[in-house]
Amino acid sequence: MRRAPLALLALVLLAGCSSEAPKPVAPVAKQPPQQETLTGRMAFQKLYQAARLWNADARCFRLESAITKESNGRDGKSGVWRAIFASPGRGIARPFTWSGLTADDAPNPGVAPAGPEDSFNPANTSTQPFDIVYLKADSDQSLEVAQKHGGEAILKKDPNQPVRYILDWNPKKSQLEWHVIYGTAELDAKLNVAVNASSGDFVRVEK
């Protein structure tokens, strides 16, 4: 009667010896940080929300993209946008940035103030705030317009040509305008095309 338990014990020991040891789990490869770019209008929405928390009457008078290693603006988008908002009631202004990049030449991801508060003069027409309802045409649409007025030839000639975008109010024409700048700055730009930010229509070639 003792043979059965002994045989069963032998089978258990044999199974234990023959089973394979668990294999070590391979470490999961670390994924690179997600790099995000946005059109000007999409970035403006994020910046506007932050500015309204800063001051309830905050209004923007300038929005501009930045050129970085990860984002050169050729698709109508940027990984970094900077906006300057004014509080007419308090007579102050403050810049904010949105960043979707983790590069060393870009601000930390997210929305944050980009500097201290400064004085603001509501009577200064060069820094006249605009109403958000005028912003209907986006930066990528403005790029398409600029491409038809000299931009296409520039990008075809130089695949690495950066493109910047500036949004501000034109007090002479009482309209909001995009400035599509083929270059890192307005002064040394190869081309600067103004586009109506409400209708998306071509306005003029500024350079």
Model-derived regions: residue spans:
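Long, terminal "pre-/pro-" and other extracytoplasmic accessory regions
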Residues: C17-K207
